[in-house]
């Protein structure tokens, strides 16, 4: 897939090799092994709507099943390929952050790109707590789902 063309069709930022955003995203994993994997592109949606746009674009007729995809939450899983994919597209969810507390319903909504440290801080400020990851820099989505999501 031409990821430069993807950038023209979706609202999310698309970063290609050599760009500052690409270097920041691919070089910021917890594991050095994961940092060595080189995707063909990285997309950073900032809303659910942008995630939907990206998924629709890579499922267009002729592309469905041909674009290798990895989903990145916090990027804290220690093995290569857990949240990164060689020559594929990384959907980097770190811009989908935020912690919303509904005290009446006793419910917390956590963005897919949020990290545990922010969750604990937000809840503590309101006299609340939860259990989750022990490492504050670890992403919530990956831990909740049992690791990052990349097909093997």
Model segments located where?
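N-terminal accessory segments
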Residues: 1-152
């Amino acid at each position: 897939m031409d990821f430069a063309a993807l950038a023209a069709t979706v609202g999310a930022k698309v970063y290609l090799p050599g760009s500052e955003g690409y270097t920041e995203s691919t070089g910021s994993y917890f594991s050095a092994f994961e940092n060595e994997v080189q995707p063909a592109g990285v997309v950073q949606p900032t809303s659910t709507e942008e995630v939907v746009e990206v998924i629709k674009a890579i499922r267009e007729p002729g592309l469905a099943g041909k674009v290798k995809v990895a989903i990145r939450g916090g990027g804290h899983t220690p093995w290569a390929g857990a949240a990164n994919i060689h020559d594929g597209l990384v959907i980097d969810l770190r811009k989908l952050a935020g912690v919303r507390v509904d005290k009446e319903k006793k419910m917390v909504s956590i963005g897919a790109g949020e990290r545990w440290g922010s969750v604990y801080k937000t809840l503590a400020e309101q006299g609340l707590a939860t259990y989750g990851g022990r490492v504050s820099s670890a992403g919530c989505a990956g831990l909740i789902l049992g690791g990052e999501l990349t097909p093997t």
